[in-house]
């Protein structure tokens, strides 16, 4: 159930379907989860200031049942920052990514929780 949310000041009409699909693939591979469970949500066109500047920036959250934590978050960060820099031109120093480990019993899909 990985869920990657990106809040950015990049205009919403600049967020392509191809980016969404690539982000889904990157998250699935990074976490070793089936892509059929991955959700990508981009909130473009947000009024944002990062470091006192309105230059392109983002604040992101990656939520997952397991597969995130101190031992693996640096690896995930490397892949996600590369995605954001390559595809949306958001520099690594203009983005925060929060990693959240969700309890299976706190997330539902298809009518029931995962645990």
Curated annotation (Swiss-Prot):
Q: Which UniProt keywords apply?
A: Cytokine, Isomerase, Secreted
What's an example of a GO molecular-function annotation for this chain?
dopachrome isomerase activity
Q: Which residues form the active site?
A: 2 (proton acceptor)
Supply the EC number(s): 5.3.2.1, 5.3.3.12
Major enzyme class: isomerase
Recorded hits in InterPro entries, A to Z, give: Macrophage_inhib_fac (IPR001398), Macrophage_inhib_fac_CS (IPR019829), Tautomerase/MIF_sf (IPR014347)
- Where does this chain mainly localize? secreted
What reaction(s) does this enzyme catalyze?
L-dopachrome = 5,6-dihydroxyindole-2-carboxylate; 3-phenylpyruvate = enol-phenylpyruvate
What GO cellular-component annotations does this UniProt entry give? extracellular space
What PROSITE patterns is this protein classified in? Answer: MIF
Residues binding substrate, per UniProt: 33, 65
Describe the task this protein carries out.
Answer: Tautomerization of the methyl ester of L-dopachrome. Inhibits migration of human peripheral blood mononuclear cells.
The record's similarity note reads: Belongs to the MIF family.
> Can you name this protein?
Macrophage migration inhibitory factor homolog
Organism encoding this protein: Brugia malayi (Filarial nematode worm)
Q: What is the lineage of its organism?
A: Eukaryota, Metazoa, Ecdysozoa, Nematoda, Chromadorea
């Amino acid at each position: 159930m990985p869920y990657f949310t990106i809040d950015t000041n990049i205009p919403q009409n600049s967020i392509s379907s191809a980016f969404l699909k690539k982000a889904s693939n990157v998250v699935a591979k990074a976490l070793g989860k089936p892509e059929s469970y991955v959700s990508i949500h981009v909130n473009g066109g947000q009024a944002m200031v990062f470091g006192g500047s309105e230059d392109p920036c983002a604040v992101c959250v990656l939520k997952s049942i397991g597969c995130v934590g101190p031992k693996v978050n640096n690896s995930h960060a490397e892949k996600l920052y590369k995605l954001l820099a390559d595809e949306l031109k958001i520099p690594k120093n203009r983005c925060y990514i929060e990693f959240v480990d969700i309890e299976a019993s706190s997330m539902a899909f298809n009518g029931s929780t995962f645990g």
